[in-house]
């Protein structure tokens, strides 16, 4: 409720701190890209999203499964797409044909854990594991 609004600046500050730690830790890792926030907006940094670029072997599903195996609660980002959920999939069964970019991006996006309970050491550990998975999962040219 309204009482939570008092804590909002603290939540946003913690989320931004986490995002910046991830940003520094994942900078320069081939095969993935941290989705940037537009500072012209007023972001709340609620999500830390990486986009896996090919040729990361196994793609998003393999990355999420490997992170879960390490007890890191990463998630597929906006999966399935709304167009594949009721009632839209029934009302518009051919929507996927019109949304190839949506399907592509959704199949490459991973949400990393964040929030006020995560410390810098935890985030750096997650980032190290993500970087290791990205490096070890790359296909040979």
Name the predicted role of every residue range.
Residues 1-141:
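PLP-dependent aminotransferase class I/II
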